[in-house]
Structure formats: C-alpha cells, structure tokens
From Swiss-Prot:
It is found in: Cytoplasm. It catalyses: L-aspartate(89)-[ribosomal protein uS12]-hydrogen + (sulfur carrier)-SH + AH2 + 2 S-adenosyl-L-methionine = 3-methylsulfanyl-L-aspartate(89)-[ribosomal protein uS12]-hydrogen + (sulfur carrier)-H + 5'-deoxyadenosine + L-methionine + A + S-adenosyl-L-homocysteine + 2 H(+). Its cofactor is [4Fe-4S] cluster. It is an enzyme of class 2 (transferase). HAMAP family: MTTase_RimO. Residues 397-466 form the TRAM domain. Its EC number is 2.8.4.4. This is Ribosomal protein uS12 methylthiotransferase RimO. GO terms for molecular function: 4 iron, 4 sulfur cluster binding; aspartic acid methylthiotransferase activity; metal ion binding; protein methylthiotransferase activity. InterPro entries: Elp3/MiaA/NifB-like_rSAM, Methylthiotransferase, Methylthiotransferase_CS, Methylthiotransferase_N, Methylthiotransferase_N_sf, MoaA_NifB_PqqE_Fe-S-bd_CS, NA-bd_OB-fold, Ribosomal_uS12_MeSTrfase_RimO. The lineage of its organism: Bacteria, Bacillati, Chloroflexota, Chloroflexia, Chloroflexales.
Length: 482
C-alpha cells in the first residue's frame, strides 16, 4: 500500500474531484500523507482555466519534482493534464498524467506504477484503452479496456468519500458545459454538460449532513443547466426540492455558477420556499453591454437580466446576488466599459468578482481584432474594483443593527489574549466573499446569531446575541471578551 499526498489547484470542482480520488485511494487501503515529503506518490490536481492558472500549475509541478526523491512518484491529474497533456507529461519529474475524465482510475495508476509512466488520453469518439508506457515509450500490456461511455459515467457514480469534513463542503452536480463562450476553453477539455443522477446527489448530501457539514455548496460549470441531458425541465428546481426534503432545516444549501438564462419562475419560487436554501445567488454575467456580450457569444439582453434581478429581489427581498465580469475583452470600447460601470452602479450587486481578459489560444476571442493593451485592461480592472468596493461597503451598511445568522468557521487568539471567532452569513460564499467577525470563542461548525455593529468594505463585525444547538434555539449568549 502507498502513502499519497494530493495538492489541489483551481476551483471548487477540482476540490470535489480531489476528494473523490482521496476516497477511492482510501477504499483500496492506501493512506493519505499530510505532506509531500511523507508520500510515496504526490498527485497534483491541475488547473487550466487561464494562462496564469497554467503557469501556476507548471510551477507547482516543477517545485514538487525538484524536491522528490528517486523513490517518489509524481502524478499530474485534472484539467491541464487533459488540455495540455503533452506539455504536462514533458515536465521533468512528472511520472504519469490523468485527465479530467479519468480520475476514477487513480487507484489503478498508483497500484501499477512504473517509472516514467504516462497515460494515453481517452478518445472521445470511440472506445480506447488506457495504456501505460514504459520509460522507453513502449506500450505495456493494458490491464483492461475502458470504454468512453463508462469513463463519462464513472465520475457520476464514483462515491465521494471525504476523509475529513469542515463546516461546509462542495457538491458537484454536473460537469462540462454546453455553452461555447468565445473566451472560454473549458468545453474543449471538459466536454458537454453531464449531470449526476438525483439519487446519487441525494445520497452524497445526506452523507455530508450526517458527517456534521452545515453548508452544502452546489457547484458545476453551469449549475442552472442541470438535468437537461437527463430530459428534465427545471432540473435544478426539481433537484433542490428533493435535496431539501432529505436535509434537516439547519443545513444550508448554496448555489454557485448559476447562469441567468437557466433561472426561471419555478427556480426562484423554489429558492424562496425552502428554509435550507441560502438567500444567495452567484450569477456570472461577464459584461453588461450588448455588443460586448455578442462578441463574447453570451446572451446580449441586458434588459432581461435587469428584470430577472428585480424578480429575484421581489421574491426574496434579502437575497445577496454575486456576479463576475470580464474587463478588457477584445474590442471593448470606453463606451462599453462605461456601460458596465453604470450597470454595476444601477444594479448594486452585493458581491462582484472581476477577471482581466486572458487571451486563450484556440478560442474565438483570441482571433478577434482590437485586442486591448495590458495597461488598459489593468486600469479598467482597478476602476471597476474601486467602484464595487464602495458599493459593497454601502450594501454592508444596510445590515448595521440587524441580526444575521453566522456559520462559525474558526477561532483564534489575538496577541493580547482576546478570543476572536470568524464565520460567514448567508450573504457570503466560502473563499470568495466576506466574513463576519466577533469577539469570543464559538465552536466551528455551529450557528450563532450576531448583531452587526460595524460594516467594512467586505466584512462585518458584531456581537453574539444567541447560539443554536442542532435545530433548537438556546437562549444564551457567548460572553464578549472586552
């Protein structure tokens, strides 16, 4: 049996895949090492989102390779191992590659390891064997055939056995994307959207809740397209009804990557009806000017988007809406950029993430004329971030004096010995949004009610007015320390 250490780069979907690999390895008797130094095999789950992510991936692979002993092996798995397999496989020290559709074979790779082995990619057009290669490049006998339909299905049926859980966990409900946005490479290595069966999702959600998870974050490349390949209309709303039927009311369900053209009346009503569903929606929009959106190959109807946001706020008055945008897309004029700023000022999103346009080889956007200079992109990024910083602060100030429920994530001690706890409200997704801080020692994984006393640009401070134990309110307060 081998000791394995997994390093995860990139998005929450990658984190779920790493947890899947971890569970498969543990089920086969392998142990997970706390560090690369202690491992027989180091797996780097790579990211290929944009050029900067690929540069980080290669840097991490080089760093791990430089430190590994002659007995250790290095596996590059995931997105960049799929999208740029030749480059990854040629990186000195990488002993094997495993693409995004192959990670359920990780135990086989670990157990049949050969020095300088590599894995042949799956051919999406026909059945194909996974063939380990010797250091001389001569094919070894393949252990057995693997058909592509099975490969696509494996990730949907493979159990995600998490060895350790925190207050929140990601649950991936689909993989791949049917959209073909001009700037995006993801469909080229993820393929079309493929949904996980509702029953499998419910089983995973119940396991997470039974393990003590208090927040389940649903993720996908395109969350609101869920179930289309299964023949479902309003698939996400149907799934949410089923999830909320099996989860206790004290478990949050959060929606991320919910594209607007999949949001309709039924989904909005479902979000408003169930107490488990956070009044929060991450809705990527990318831009707000119709001409920019057309070049992006995104729906250009900004007026429809405004109406959708109005509908969401009418049905769920306290909803926190997050969006992401791209600045510096080819041909973005100053007029188009100003229209984006005006849109943010008008709509008043609670949370916003902004990407600088990255010219990705092979995408339609890379061939567009009028590519913007990096200095212009950088200037526009800073301008839009300054605007959103002010908007975020103003949105936060609306909560002064009000009580918010907070999921406690951690605690610590200041230099002068005061205990400080930190968590998130329903308005804050893990890793990308703000936090709520308060004095005192609260137990991670519990809910507390906090009265907001200070609003910063992205975070809130407050005083605890009550704690929750299970599903019942306890009328007591954590004593403030100073």
């Amino acid at each position: 049996m081998m000791k394995v250490h997994i390093i995860t780069l990139g998005c929450p979907k990658n984190q779920v895949d790493s947890e899947g690999m971890s569970g498969i390895l543990a089920a086969q008797g392998h142990t997970l090492a706390a560090s690369a130094d202690d491992a027989d095999v180091v797996i780097v789950n790579t990211c290929s989102f944009i050029a900067a992510a690929r540069e980080e991936t290669l840097a991490v692979l080089r760093d791990v390779a430089a430190c590994k002993t002659p007995e250790q092996r290095l596996v590059a798995a995931g997105c960049m191992a799929e999208s740029h397999r030749a480059i990854v496989a040629a990186t000195p020290g990488v002993d094997a590659t495993l693409g995004t559709r192959e990670w359920t074979r990780i135990a086989e790779v670990v157990e049949t390891f050969q020095p300088a082995a590599t894995m042949a990619p799956l051919n999406a057009a026909s059945a194909r064997e996974i063939i380990p290669l010797t250091s001389a490049g001569v094919p070894s006998p393949a252990p057995h055939d693997l058909s592509v339909p099975g490969a696509y299905a494996d990730w949907r049926t493979a159990p995600i056995r998490r060895r350790a859980v925190g207050p929140s966990a990601y649950l991936k409900i689909s993989d791949g994307c049917n959209l073909r946005c001009a700037f995006c490479t993801i469909p080229s290595f993820k393929g079309d959207m493929r949904s996980k069966a509702i029953g499998a999702i419910l089983g995973e959600a119940q396991e997470l809740a039974a393990a003590g998870v208090k927040e389940i974050v649903l993720v996908a490349q395109h969350l609101t397209d869920y179930g289309r390949d299964l023949g479902l209309k309003d698939g996400l709303a149907i799934l949410l009804d089923e999830i909320c039927a099996v989860l206790p009311e004290n478990v949050w369900v959060r929606l991320m990557y919910a594209y607007p053209h999949g949001i309709g009346e039924r989904l909005i009503a479902t979000m408003a009806r169930h107490p488990q569903i956070c009044h929060y929606l991450d809705m990527p929009l990318q831009h707000a000017h119709p001409e920019t959106l057309r070049r992006m190959r995104r729906p250009p109807d900004t007026d429809r988007t405004r109406r959708l946001i109005d509908d969401l706020r009418a049905a769920i008055p306290d909803i926190a809406i997050r969006s992401t945008f791209i600045v510096g897309f080819p041909g973005e004029t100053n007029t188009e950029f100003r229209a984006l700023l005006a849109f943010l000022e008008d709509v008043q999103f609670d949370r916003v993430g902004v990407f600088r346009y990255s010219r990705e080889p092979g995408t339609p956007a890379a061939a567009l004329p009028d590519q913007l200079a990096p200095r212009i992109i950088e200037r526009r990024w800073h301008e839009i971030m300054r605007l959103q910083q002010r908007i975020s602060r103003e949105r936060n100030r609306r909560w002064l004096g009000r009580v918010v429920r907070v999921l406690v994530e951690g605690q610590g001690q200041t230099d002068d010995g005061r205990m400080l706890s930190v968590g998130r409200s329903f308005r804050d997704a893990p890793e990308v949004d703000g936090q709520v801080l308060f004095w005192g020692a609260a137990t991670p994984g519990t809910f507390v009610d906090v009265r907001v006393t200070q609003a910063l640009d992205y975070d809130l401070w407050g005083d605890v007015v009550g704690v929750l134990d299970g599903e019942e309110r306890i009328v007591k307060c954590i004593q403030s320390v100073g």
